[in-house]
Amino acid sequence: MSFTDQVKHEVSRLESNNKMCQLAELSALIMMNGSIQIINKNLAVKVRLYHGDLARKVYKLIKERFELNIEIMVRRRNHFSTYQNIYDLFLPPQPGIEVFLKKVGVLDEDHNLLFRIKKELVTSKSCQKSYVRGAFLGGGSVNNPRGEYHLEFRCEHESFAEDLLMLLKRFGLEGHLTEHRKKYVVYFKSFSEVATILNIIGAHKALLKLEDNKVLKEVKNGVNRRVNCETANLDKTVKAAMLQLEDIELIEKTRGLETLSNSLQEIAIIRKKYPYASLKELGKLLDPPLSKSGVNHRLRRIKSIANEIRGER
């Protein structure tokens, strides 16, 4: 089950006791997934849904609030090599259907189609949340939290998408609107925005999963940064050691290590014996032990002698 399906499965089971909020959620679902049909000059409505829990919820809301007749058709389709149920809820022409369409904001009082959010449905904060939940259930999707953060709403009409974006901005969100494949997409791409929307729609289990994955990402990124830093330091240490060994080899071949002072002879012999040791490790091998800066000072003196030899040749 995809993360989107998990979220929709979770929030499909949420029910509001507020009748206006129920209407707000139903309105958003129909605006996202509904279509108007005309049969013998009479209006009919079809709502296409892809989750059984959601189909039952919409059926129950319409039945309880409007007492309309609803026909349910279920069929299966092959979707990306998996079979998926499609639930078509069909409201045939009948008395009360125009009242229903006006209540959910599909028709205005003059029987014109509306492609905007009905303001009366989103006056309270709780109804605004219900509307966003309905919009997500109808046309929302969210990326797996292990990947990049992305949550979107795919809308049929630009004016409705603009209204939805403005509604989401009331929650302090800054989304974006774009057109893609004849749909108008309202989308968000940051952790905080995705987390806020999951909280708005009541997907608290999904929100916990999102937060858990964020922690894992941060730990993984921290480990990677540390490994990269340690690798870079190791490369630097090895490169410096190779140059030091070249200096020591040059002195040994031309003048002999015995020409060096005792302290320089000691560090030259230790470096040859432990070519990949760090300066700190070399210092601990000396007798008596020497600080990192002391080791570095001796190796710089060896480099100066080697450079003198190079200048003579």
Swiss-Prot record:
Keywords: Cell cycle, Cell division, DNA-binding. One of its GO terms (biological process) is cell division. The keyword Membrane does not apply. Belongs to the WhiA family. One of its GO terms (molecular function) is DNA binding. The lineage of its organism: Bacteria, Bacillati, Bacillota, Clostridia, Halanaerobiales. Residues 278-311 bind DNA. The gene is whiA. The keyword Transferase does not apply. This is Probable cell division protein WhiA. It comes from the Bacteria. Involved in cell division and chromosome segregation.
